[in-house]
Curated annotation (Swiss-Prot):
This is ADP-L-glycero-D-manno-heptose-6-epimerase. It comes from Neisseria meningitidis serogroup B (strain ATCC BAA-335 / MC58). The gene is hldD. The keyword Transcription regulation does not apply. Homopentamer. Pfam families: Epimerase. NADP(+) binds at residues 11-12, 32-33, 39, 54, 77-81, 94, 145, 172, 180.
Amino acid sequence: MTIIVTGAAGFIGSNIVKALNQRGITDIVAVDNLSKGEKFKNLAECEIAHYLDKHEFIRQVREHILPYQNIEAVFHQGACSDTMNHDGLYMMDNNYQYTLDLLDWCQDERIPFLYASSAAVYGKGEIFREERELEKPLNVYGYSKFLFDQVLRRRMKEGLTAQVVGFRYFNVYGQHEQHKGRMASVAFHHFHQYREHGYVNLFGSNDGYGNGEQTRDFVSVEDVAKVNLYFFDHPELSGIYNLGTGRSQQFNELAAATVNACRAAEGKPEMSLKELVEEELIRYIPFPDALKGKYQSFTQADITKLREAGYKEEFFDVKSGVDRYVKWMLENLA
């Protein structure tokens, strides 16, 4: 049985491939666009059966000529995730139409289809629950994800031939994101700031939040891969699900976890947030004027629906997840 993973050389895709490998599954077709060649490193530690360029894959899907038999599932992680890319033509073709073509093909062939949606569909909302009235995307990236989620909702009412699951990822961090540049997680950037400068910067107070007190639902990519595989194991489940921890934690906590993990590797003792600030290992910079009124100061996934679907595993909190991530970066990137 063959499994297809799109975006397989990317951040989440490569972690799904790795998680499948840990189950002994290697009959995997990895689909990606390696024009950014350094992404190959994410697959170098994985076992796959074949690599297929994204454009050739799309052509074969659209012409219904993919040569693989007994495809067990498609994990669709291939998309433009740059929220600052405002090229609507590219975004809608790459994120919406590509995903729609894959959905149609999977439904025709009765193949389970698990795809990456995004918490960006909620825009600046304060309630993050999988309900249409709460969804107000602020950019074309969020809209591309939102629009496809609406397609799934309509298809579910009409009746599906095979499982379809969309995961609304919140703030994902973890190994294999180094190719993402400015779009990499805050944990990644804090690690490199601390290693280069000996301190990390956080935004100061804004919008009623104190220094570094803005919060996010930070979720480890290890947990993201686990949830994907849980639904792979349960093909009777379809729908749209938030994929976060259900906790909202401060950037202060993330910065402290990163700095303390780096300090531990240096044989230095853990310090409290107060001590880290006093020693200027965490510093605050004025909140940028350009972001005022546009910045989301709070996110927290409502994971009620995920729990109701039977997923019972506990998620890493920031301290434990970042500690694991920093150890990986010290071994692989430092």
